[in-house]
Each structure stands twice: as structure tokens, then as C-alpha cells.
């Protein structure tokens, strides 16, 4: 009788949960101050007007308004928040 006693355990078989990164508020959406606009690793997108950046590179609204994405120098992408007073003009 062939027996298989002690098989070694696999070195694989584990994974970490996804980090839920990405755009949380898209262009044209209304935001209030403090709303997270983008969660990212590194500065894929840079903060524009009325947008702050956290220590983990999260971009968030500093004022109430409407989200706008645009590109700038060196091919960088920027996100700004246009206040509702600016949008009305």
C-alpha cells in the first residue's frame, strides 16, 4: 500500500485586500469641503484650485463647488474645484 504521509505546505495561497483607490468624485459632480476626490498612490493627479493633498496623496476639496479635471504643463493632470459662484459667472 502506498501511503503519502507528510506533504509540505504550499508557499503560495495568500493575498491582500484591494486598497479601494481611484476617483471618488468625477468631473462635474458637486462636492462639499472635505470630500475626497481621488485616492491614489503617488501623485498621478495633482491638486489644482481649491484642492488639498493629504500625506498619502489623497486629493480632497477645500471648498464647496464642482469638480473639474484638466491637464497642465509637463503633461500633468490636475483636478480643481470651481466654486458655485465662479461657475455662475
Curated annotation (Swiss-Prot):
GO molecular function (one): structural constituent of ribosome
Span list, region Disordered: 1-20
A Pfam family: Ribosomal_L27
GO BP, sorted A to Z: translation
InterPro entries listed in its UniProt record: Ribosomal_bL27, Ribosomal_bL27_CS
SUPFAM superfamilies: Ribosomal L27 protein-like
TM stretches of this protein: none
Domain of life according to the entry: Bacteria
UniProt keywords, alphabetically: Ribonucleoprotein, Ribosomal protein
GO cellular component: cytosolic large ribosomal subunit
Name of the gene this protein is made from: rpmA
Name the record gives this protein: Large ribosomal subunit protein bL27
Family: Belongs to the bacterial ribosomal protein bL27 family.
